[in-house]
Design a protein with these regions (language model features):
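N-terminal ordered "arm"
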Residues: 25, 35, 42-91
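Extracytoplasmic/secretory-pathway segments with low complexity and glycosylation-like composition
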Residues: 133-176, 184, 212-215
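N-terminal acidic leader/helix
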Residues: 6-15
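Intrinsically disordered, low-complexity coil/linker segments enriched for acidic/polar
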Residues: 7, 20, 31-36
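Extracellular/secreted glycoprotein ectodomains characterized by long, lumenal stretches
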Residues: 94, 127, 153, 177-181
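Structured domain cores in non-transmembrane regions
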Residues: 78-148
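Acidic, proline/glycine-rich low-complexity IDRs
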Residues: 35, 46, 58, 168-215
Length: 215
């Protein structure tokens, strides 16, 4: 007789997980009870409002014409193995689910991978999310125009300016005393040309006006 406290089905986004005795065994192998999985699904389900998210189904279900799966908020995980175990748990009706990332949202396209993400990509996405929270998504996206990883973002990030010339004026005001070195000729200093030279060799500016030192 089935336990009356355990639901016989768990709703996902498109479809349901049938809670059979074998499914309960697989969940236990992954460190879940049915109640644990219900709570985890609430915690990890993405609202698709900008957070880094992936829709996780399986190749087996997809080949059978089913889109059963769940939008998962990656920022709710700190550990790649925990993420994988949760994905396997929501597909515990398969003996050995081959996970399939069917859609993506909220992180750069270079980490989209239908064949499912690697641990390195997962770590990059979590770092991306944390940097977006600390700085801004526009700043991090600008950096990603020039780089594939985020290791040097904080060392490289200078701030946001309206133009290369504005940034050149900032550099001059911070680093030089033109009036002392040039006298009245300081009024004729070509900030536009100086800005072009800075961004030719030492700096980059993204589409949103964020500036990065080349490190």
């Amino acid at each position: 007789m089935s336990n009356p406290q355990i639901p016989t089905k768990m709703k996902l986004l498109f479809g349901e997980l049938d809670i059979t005795p074998r499914v309960e065994e697989r969940l236990e192998e992954l460190g879940y009870t049915v109640a644990d999985l219900q709570e985890a699904a609430i915690k990890h389900k993405s609202d698709c409002d900008g957070q880094p998210s992936v829709y996780v189904g399986t190749y087996g279900k997809y080949n059978d014409g089913s889109l059963c799966g769940l939008w998962i908020d990656l920022s709710t995980f700190n550990d790649f193995d925990d993420f994988i175990d949760f994905c396997k748990a929501i597909h515990a009706d398969e003996e050995d689910p081959e996970l399939m990332a069917q859609d993506f949202e909220g992180f750069p396209r270079q980490w989209y991978n239908e064949g499912f993400m690697s641990e390195n990509d997962f770590d990059n996405i979590i770092e991306y999310s944390e940097l977006c929270d600390k700085y801004s998504q526009e700043a991090v996206d600008d950096y990603m125009e020039f780089h594939d990883e985020l290791d040097d973002f904080e060392e490289a990030y200078c701030g946001e300016w309206d133009s290369e010339e504005d940034f050149a004026r900032h550099i001059v005001s911070e680093c030089y005393d033109l009036e002392k070195s040039m006298g009245e000729l300081a009024n004729y200093f070509d900030y536009e040309a100086f800005g072009r030279e800075l961004f030719m060799w030492d700096y980059s500016m993204g589409a949103n006006g964020n500036v990065f030192r080349r490190v």
